[in-house]
């Protein structure tokens, strides 16, 4: 599924900011944004960090 940058920001905002995995996801997201890989966020297991 294709996500626009604003949709990805909404998804990332649901992640608790103090979670170390959240920082990791944000790093992957920024890396993907630099490389122009919009699909990179879908490979991150968001369910694992929801408590």
Swiss-Prot record:
One of its GO terms (biological process) is regulation of cell shape. Coiled coil: none annotated. One of its GO terms (cellular component) is perinuclear region of cytoplasm. GO terms for molecular function: actin filament binding; small GTPase binding; translation repressor activity. Keywords: Actin-binding, Cell projection, Cell shape, Cytoplasm, Developmental protein, Differentiation, Neurogenesis, Synapse, Synaptosome. It comes from the Eukaryota. It is found in: Cytoplasm; Cytoplasm, Perinuclear region; Cell projection, Lamellipodium; Cell projection, Ruffle. Its main location: cytoplasm. Component of the CYFIP1-EIF4E-FMR1 complex which binds to the mRNA cap and mediates translational repression. In the CYFIP1-EIF4E-FMR1 complex this subunit is an adapter between EIF4E and FMR1. Promotes the translation repression activity of FMR1 in brain probably by mediating its association with EIF4E and mRNA. Regulates formation of membrane ruffles and lamellipodia. Plays a role in axon outgrowth. Binds to F-actin but not to RNA. Part of the WAVE complex that regulates actin filament reorganization via its interaction with the Arp2/3 complex. Component of the WAVE1 complex composed of ABI2, CYFIP1 or CYFIP2, BRK1, NCKAP1 and WASF1/WAVE1. Within the complex, a heterodimer containing NCKAP1 and CYFIP1 interacts with a heterotrimer formed by WAVE1, ABI2 and BRK1. Component of the CYFIP1-EIF4E-FMR1 complex which is composed of CYFIP, EIF4E and FMR1. Interacts with FMR1 but does not bind to related proteins FXR1 or FXR2. Interaction with EIF4E stimulates FMR1 binding. Component of the WAVE2 complex composed of ABI1, CYFIP1/SRA1, NCKAP1/NAP1 (NCKAP1l/HEM1 in hematopoietic cells) and WASF2/WAVE2. Belongs to the CYFIP family. This is Cytoplasmic FMR1-interacting protein 1. It comes from Bos taurus (Bovine). The lineage of its organism: Eukaryota, Metazoa, Chordata, Craniata, Vertebrata.
């Amino acid at each position: 599924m294709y996500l626009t940058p604003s949709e990805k920001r909404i998804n990332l905002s649901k992640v608790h900011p103090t979670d170390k995995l959240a920082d990791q996801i944000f790093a992957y997201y920024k890396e993907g944004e630099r490389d122009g890989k919009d699909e990179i966020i879908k490979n991150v297991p968001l369910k694992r960090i929801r408590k």
